[in-house]
Amino acid sequence: MDTNSKTKVQTENKKIKAKFIHNHGQKPSLIQITPPMISSTLFHAYPLLLIFDNALANIMWLSDDKCLTFIYLTSIWLTISFFIPVETEASHFLPFTKILRLWLGIISGAFLFLSFMYYIVSLIASLRDTEPPTLDEIVVLLESVLDKLEVLRNELNVWKKLKLSFDGVNKECSGKRLFCRLFLFGTIFQIIIMRYISPGTYTRFFIITGLIYNTSSFQATLRLLWRFTAVRNFYYLGIESFKISSFLPKHLKMEQIIPLSQGRAITVPLVEVLPKLLRDKKGDDHIHILQLLLNEQKDNFGNEDLKILEIEVYENQRRWYQNKNWSTKLLPYERQNYCIEIKNTDGTLTMRSCLPPDGLGEEELPNNWHWINDNWDGTDWIYSDSAWKEIGQYSSLESFTRSRKWKRRLFHL
């Protein structure tokens, strides 16, 4: 056999093995960085974490066995009916109904208790027969429990959800105003309900509603109802009543905007600001500005101050699902197409509807106010989601609303 043939045979008999080069530092094991006392505590708490995680999964309808969760729900309903009876009219079948409700309540309560005990016993037996969990598995289970608790905390924090919703619609909503409206609305709503529904039925309704809140059917129903404008108006009840005073018109004009915006005006010496006023003026504009100042009939302009106010008008648009173009049609409870930010007496800000910038520029200014800029200066669009939460300066699939500012300055001597 020649040399080339021998080399070829040796090459074919060789096995090719992949060699991985780790150029980056690997994550250290949790066993090496976790103190022994914490590791021991987590190991002993592992069965409790499993029980708690399974209970949260059933409450949030995350279990794979939906039928078992429905059986639990039915048993809870029958048990609640035993402890919270419903007032019924007297009839010949009333004793039989009470006995049936008593029997079903006891059986359902016993079923829930025995089912829970059977799960605990089977879990302990399973943990004895299997290998002990690693620290990584315990940490993953702990993170799962914390994530579920975080979801439940956000769902139960009704105040925060309403506050964020109202802030997105009306820029900023004070906690005091929100509490007053929720208290008044909630009190009237409770009185109406308690007039026609017994306390037992009322309590059972809220308990069962809380238990089925996370089901896919309930969430799908809420999403379908949210598509109706009447439902959204009912949810945001009271937003349109956030007004400075009741006598203000629907669309603010310059004669209302200037007094309401006086708090943002700045006062500067006339000698310092006059060159800046005349800097960008050409031709007859110089004469016009000087004539406006001379018409004030001031003897000594050197000691006079000039009040400058900047007006900011927000232009808002929305994009609907059936149309890819941006539209000026907005929902009734949210911002108007053109609005201005007004400061309330308690320090909060309110968005009030106003005329378009072109319409405001054509109006006659009150109290010897005069425009500094000849035209309105517009900013770039700021894109937001459906709740007017800012996303960025570029349009995306998540952006359904957008807003920009139109600015123009005035002066008053």
Swiss-Prot record:
Ranges facing Cytoplasmic side: 88-103, 203-413
Pfam families in the record: Pex24p
UniProt KW Ribonucleoprotein keyword: no
TM region(s), chain numbering: 67-87, 104-124, 182-202
Parts of the chain on the Peroxisomal side: 1-66, 125-181
Source taxon at top rank: Eukaryota
GO-annotated biological processes: peroxisome organization
Subcellular location: Peroxisome membrane
Coiled coil, from the record: none
GO cellular component, one term: peroxisomal membrane
Keywords from the named record: Membrane, Peroxisome, Transmembrane, Transmembrane helix
Principal cellular location given in the protein's record: membrane
Similarity field: Belongs to the PEX28-32 family. PEX32 subfamily.
Protein name: Peroxisomal membrane protein PEX32
Naturally occurring in which organism (per UniProt): Saccharomyces cerevisiae (strain ATCC 204508 / S288c) (Baker's yeast)
Gene name of the encoded protein: PEX32
